[in-house]
Amino acid sequence: MNFMLTLLTNTLLALLLVTIAFWLPQTNVYSEKSSPYECGFDPMGSARLPFSMKFFLVAITFLLFDLEIALLLPLPWASQANNLEVMLTTALLLISLLAISLAYEWSQKGLEWTE
């Protein structure tokens, strides 16, 4: 019962804060406030640098693979548990997921830097 009350309270509080942030208007928005500031001088170049979407996709792919590998790190300590078959099955599933997702990324040309 305490868990459900805590979960309900946290959910309602989060929804309330998101609603307040969404509905409150942003005040005092004018061009001077939203323009880039470069030590009191006019900017020498564009403040908005172009962003490579390919770099973003490779970075997200790296983070996902890094997270999956981090899931494998505690497995040597899990090998000391009573149920070794569950640990080996979990390791096999994680490694299979890594291999399948790597093959998919490779087939979709998601790992190639040039277009």
UniProtKB/Swiss-Prot annotation:
Gene Ontology biological-process annotations: mitochondrial electron transport, NADH to ubiquinone
Pfam families xref list: Oxidored_q4
Topology in the lipid bilayer: Multi-pass membrane protein
Keywords for this protein: Electron transport, Membrane, Mitochondrion, Mitochondrion inner membrane, NAD, Respiratory chain, Translocase, Transmembrane, Transmembrane helix, Transport, Ubiquinone
GO molecular function, one term: NADH dehydrogenase (ubiquinone) activity
One GO cellular component term noted in the UniProt record for this chain: NADH dehydrogenase complex
Primary residence: mitochondrion
Entry-linked InterPro entries: NADH_UbQ/plastoQ_OxRdtase_su3, NDAH_ubi_oxred_su3_sf
Segments passing through the bilayer: 3-23, 55-75, 84-104
Enzyme class: translocase
The enzyme's E.C. designation: 7.1.1.2
Places the protein is found: Mitochondrion inner membrane
Catalyzed reactions per annotation: a ubiquinone + NADH + 5 H(+)(in) = a ubiquinol + NAD(+) + 4 H(+)(out)
Domain of life: Eukaryota
Assembly with partners or alone: Core subunit of respiratory chain NADH dehydrogenase (Complex I) which is composed of 45 different subunits. Interacts with TMEM186. Interacts with TMEM242.
Task performed by this protein: Core subunit of the mitochondrial membrane respiratory chain NADH dehydrogenase (Complex I) which catalyzes electron transfer from NADH through the respiratory chain, using ubiquinone as an electron acceptor. Essential for the catalytic activity of complex I.
Homology family: Belongs to the complex I subunit 3 family.
Protein name: NADH-ubiquinone oxidoreductase chain 3
